[in-house]
């Protein structure tokens, strides 16, 4: 409903309500268009949901998967008979491992692994879709703040998690996929079915390639210079760093959400430290309260965020701190143990409507009835995390099973999730 309300505010009032994987035909002055949305409902998919869009004019079929991660693609074949052009994200925005306090060697190892795993997962989807042409799109992010410029992949760092299109296209070629196309804003590709008629860039081809190769650092520096007034204006609109203590405003915002979210709060399972300049507050999820820290209190998870950012999202009644703060990478974090999916779900569900949806989803997401065999182990077919088909995405190495959809891992000897609290896997040796 968030998107619909925003569109209505812009003047749109004719909407076609649909369901997951249901094809519709829309008629207009230029002819008919078949449309289908593959919907993902999990709180961890985008801001509590994501989707892929399929369009066909009866001759050419395009699947814009963007950064969604569908659990099944059966409807592509059954409804459209295949895909000609596949647009997909291979290098999404995220903050791990860069913002975490950890040894540099560990950060480099995790970054290298994450860089390759993201491209491997995307290649798996490309193989499953089987389109003639693949257009890597929707990423990577570009960091223009001087203090964040090091996050761009422009200095040959194998641990950088934001590879660009040229890097991914080379990965495709290395694995036998020669149908990759490079497009930038303003590029026009003309297709008739699986036939590429033309590909036209807004600037000469050698200049396009230079942006991603020898001239990349200079391009980003020039881009940052052009956008500096825009960034300055945006920051001028932030709330001031100084002001009244933040304890009460955060308490007023968080406590009603905590009281309405048993699954999420119990899933988090411990108090979380929130440092904002000179002030520290504790979000005590087990007790559903926001409070001051106890002397010498230790925490399993903590964040340090500039107070002006917190005051801004509170002032603006922002429902999703993941989108506004965490994805900006303008924060630090520390933790003992693994990633806590429930914690970040809480921060993206700061409205009654959102938290009710997410809590309900977690309450229902426990189907583990089907069983498969993987490398000498019987395991439940659906991943305990987001229900991915482990027959497709599961990889066994020794006594560890990894779901390559999101990179979560389990100890096959115990069924314990090695990535996050909860989410046990039903498994046993064959």
Each predicted region: which residue ranges?
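Active-site HxH/HxHxD metal-binding segment of metal-dependent hydrolases
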Residues: 1-27, 31, 396-427
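Acidic carboxylate-rich catalytic motifs and surrounding loops in phosphoryl-/glycosyl-chemistry enzymes
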Residues: 19, 138-139, 178-190
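Conserved C-terminal region and hinge/linker of Rieske [2Fe-2S] proteins, especially
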Residues: 35-40, 423-430
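Divalent metal-coordination and catalytic microenvironments
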Residues: 67, 134, 329
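Cap/insert and terminal regions of metallo-dependent hydrolase folds
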Residues: 73-176
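Feature captures hydrophobic
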Residues: 189-382, 389-393, 401
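Cys/His-rich microdomains that often coordinate metals
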Residues: 387-390, 410
